[in-house]
A protein has these predicted regions:
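Hydrophobic anchor residue at the start of the ABC signature
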Residues: 166
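The feature captures the beta-strand-to-loop junction immediately N-terminal to the Walker
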Residues: 57-59
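Catalytic Walker B motif of ABC-type/P-loop ATPase nucleotide-binding domains
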Residues: 177-180
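Conserved signature/switch motifs of ABC ATPase nucleotide-binding domains
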Residues: 151-154, 172
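ABC ATPase NBD coupling module
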Residues: 87-105, 124, 129, 133
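Conserved ABC ATPase "signature" region
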Residues: 130-148
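Helix-to-loop junction immediately C-terminal to a conserved catalytic motif
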Residues: 72
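Short coil-to-helix segment of the ABC ATPase nucleotide-binding domain corresponding to the Q-loop/switch region
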Residues: 112-119
Length: 192
């Protein structure tokens, strides 16, 4: 097959098709905690499209984590609405296998080795529990954990623990992946 140059119309149609599906909408989302005088977040409006890669930047304490926790249903907004038009969950996670969240802290189960920590979501969401060991090992290789499968969390550095958390989030092949500072614990030479 030879090289084919797309016309401007064809190129624009490909872009339009890619971004035609809005997967998340935030309309006037605000959050005020009872312990705070000012809102943590105020009147956030956002559309996230299929295949988007979106980074939320800001200083410490500006509400990035709060926003992500609201998007995945861990906390509710004080006002406004979060919609997931193309997903099976609305304002709360009714089908968590469609969404994965990587927290700032890895939250690994200390009595499980790396392999079992990664496989845990497949055991919880039984529809994916048939996943072959080969696929799990592909994810282990992808995040740079080959050779660490039998290690326990206490034997891992902070960066390696975060890799386990990222692998665990990827194993269900979620439609939406939310990550809260996932690379902060990884050293420069070991980042993906």
């Amino acid at each position: 097959m030879g090289l084919r140059i797309l016309s401007e119309q064809e190129r624009q149609k490909k872009i339009d098709d890619k971004y035609s599906a809005i997967i998340a909408q935030l309309n006037g989302v605000s959050k005020k905690f009872k312990s705070s005088k000012a809102p943590s977040l105020e009147d956030i409006n956002l559309e996230v499209y299929q295949e988007d890669f979106l980074s939320i930047l800001g200083s410490s304490g500006c509400g990035k984590t709060t926003l992500l926790k609201m998007m995945c249903g861990l906390i509710k907004p004080t006002s406004g609405k979060i919609n997931w038009p193309t997903s099976n969950f609305q304002n709360s996670v009714e089908n968590p296998a469609n969404l994965s969240f990587v927290f700032q802290e890895p939250n690994l189960l200390p009595w499980m080795n790396v392999y079992d920590n990664i496989k845990l979501p497949l055991k919880i969401y039984k529809e994916n529990s048939y996943k072959a060991d080969e696929e799990i090992y592909d994810i282990i290789n992808l995040v740079g954990l080959k050779g660490f499968e039998e290690y326990y969390p206490r034997q891992l550095s902070g960066g390696m623990s975060m890799r386990v958390s990222i692998a665990r989030a990827l194993v269900t092949q979620p439609k939406v992946l939310l990550m809260d500072e996932p690379f902060s614990a990884l050293d420069e030479t070991r980042r993906f």
